[in-house]
Amino acid sequence: MRVTGITPQDLKAYGINDIQEVVYNPDYDTLYREELDPSLEGYERGVLTDLGAVAVDTGIFTGRSPKDKYIVRDDTTRDTLWWSDNGKGKNDNKPLTPETWQHLKGLVTQQLSGKRLFIIDAFCGANPDSRLSVRFITEVAWQAHFVKNMFIRPSDDELEGFEPDFIVMNGAKCTNPDWQAQGLNSENFVAFNLTERMQLIGGTWYGGEMKKGMFSIMNYLLPLKGIASMHCSANVGEKGDVAVFFGLSGTGKTTLSTDPKRRLIGDDEHGWDDDGVFNFEGGCYAKTIRLSEEAEPDIYHAIRRDALLENVTVRDDGSIDFDDASKTENTRVSYPIYHIDNIVKPVSKAGHATKVIFLTADAFGVLPPVSRLTASQTQYHFLSGFTAKLAGTERGVTEPTPTFSACFGAAFLMLHPTQYSEVLVKRMQAAGAQAYLVNTGWNGTGKRISIKDTRAIIDAILNGSLDDAETFTLPLFNLAIPTSLPGVDERILDPRNTYASPEQWQEKAQQLAQLFISNFEKYTDTPAGAALVSAGPQR
């Protein structure tokens, strides 16, 4: 048995016994050879593409499985967590008994015992004083590759004294036969224990469960320290001006923050502390459906050796059909952040944000492409988190459907949404930041607003020209809309212009306004929440 960097005793402490071999923190060349090994079968085996990146399939699990997510309810979490069975807000934080946790842990450790394992030690969080040291344990080479791409890679010196704060054991090949007797959703599980500081994965091969699992943990720990934890991308301009982009999967966080005129801090998960905005990750996880070199050159060129593609269609000659959504709309690529040339170096962090952008993909075609928010509207729309749940980011979702996701990331919140709102508002007020609502979705034509127009809108926000523009108020929603912006077709700025008649817009707008009002009722049981009702659409 060969073991490098970790001992059998380390693994026995987790319940993993009789290991054949540990491949500890392998380099990219090793992972490349391992995942292309012709003796591998099924979802373990990767395919080489003509761009140099390896592609893998994740089976039926082409997105997260929120219905299979559980958190142990014990003395650590009982009074702090936002539980699915407590209060008005709907969420995925289903309680798990310590007894069922022990059963699931036994299944995963049994699966990993006696195997050849890949172990990756990495950091979550770019700031040493608040980062998590995470140990990922898996028997699948490409899953190790995924976390090596997505998390912050320690230096050799940092690895020498590495003590994990959190353990992730991925037993994708095992399932739970006793799920019905235990009152669970299915044989698959993604379970967390905040006391043991551990995540267990069973049944699902989707790599994003490891990424979003650690994001959920940061979302638990940081706000309790007064640090904002945000589902957003972030970049910084030449003058040090920082912008953050909130939004659910597929609304444009990665695309819009990857800007040749600005340096990327990160594309999905960030904190905001006394020093400024910092990335949680060491990589990017971009959607690739209908990707083209012309429309998104930075992401396209990041797909090369060491990138890892998921669920794309690879032709016999190794070329990729990015337009093929037969497996899923949620085709993805993970790559280390340095595959993007224009990034903040050497550490993915910058100063305080002055521009806060809420991205929404409005399936109704009601909201304007851009509006400038007041302070109370900022809180209202942050807590509402309206968007369309875009096809494929969760299993079973194939058509755009309207949804409300608190803080633009309810699936990853472990505390009540108002706790995130309070911390964000404090950070924004201290920095003098301004918020904007940007619709990257549809309008009355039935077509999606073009990336070209959205980029011109983002430019106007970042260079200050939107703040100087004349505005008018959109009825019902009371949103301040610019009358004109450089490089943007003026006719689309007022969504009513994209309908055959203003009455058609009014009808859809009343429908959407009612959805906003109904959704926000869950926050009206507190004085602070009730005070924000007037900042939203009115009947």
UniProtKB/Swiss-Prot annotation:
EC top class named in words: lyase
Pathway(s): Carbohydrate biosynthesis; gluconeogenesis
Cofactor(s) the protein needs: Mn(2+)
Location (main, coarse): cytoplasm
Keyword annotations of the record: ATP-binding, Cytoplasm, Decarboxylase, Gluconeogenesis, Lyase, Manganese, Metal-binding, Nucleotide-binding
Residues the record lists as binding substrate: R64, Y206, K212, R332
An annotated GO cellular component: cytosol
Record EC number: 4.1.1.49
Keyword Lipoprotein recorded: no
NCBIfam families assigned to the protein according to its UniProt record, in alphabetical order: pckA, PRK09344.1-1, PRK09344.1-2, PRK09344.1-3
Subunit structure: Monomer.
Family: Belongs to the phosphoenolpyruvate carboxykinase (ATP) family.
Listed name of the protein: Phosphoenolpyruvate carboxykinase (ATP)
Organism: Cronobacter sakazakii (strain ATCC BAA-894) (Enterobacter sakazakii)
